[in-house]
Every structure is written in structure tokens, then in C-alpha cells.
Amino acid sequence: MRIYFTRGINDEVAKNTQFAKEIVESIKRYCNHDWGDLCAEDKEMNEKALKHGGRLLAAYKLSVAKVYIITDDTKANEWVTTILFASEY
């Protein structure tokens, strides 16, 4: 799995160590299928995507702002994950 930060996330991580720690914790939660602040329907869609393929989405309210973690399966069967501010979506 490749993980990418948007410019906004990258800039905030570079200047804010607390936020950087929150991002690491969010990634750990995501890897453990803790989808954060999603409704039950979106969480169920993630569970189906794990079994049958598709996009995964998580949302976490951090100290600076809400962030999304989104994973897509590419045509090369490689998981690509992007972390972005909700405002960047």
C-alpha cells in the first residue's frame, strides 16, 4: 500500500508535531478497520469493499480539522491511499 498526503496535510505535518502524531494514530486506526466518524451505512460499505473490492473511506476529527483517508485499488491491484483535509475533497 502506498500512502500519499495532499499538500495541505504535508504542510501541516511539517509544522505541527501534534498533528503529525494524530495522523500516525489515524493511520493505525484505519489499518485496524476503525473507520472513525462515519455513519453506519458508510462503515458497512467499507466492510463490503474489503470483501469484494472497492473504495475505502474513513473520517477523523483531529485537532486542526477533519481529515479523510481514502484507499482505491488501482488496475495494477495496488492499494493507493490518500490522506487529505475534508476541505480538500
Where are these regions (language model features)?
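Compact soluble domain cores
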Residues: 1-58
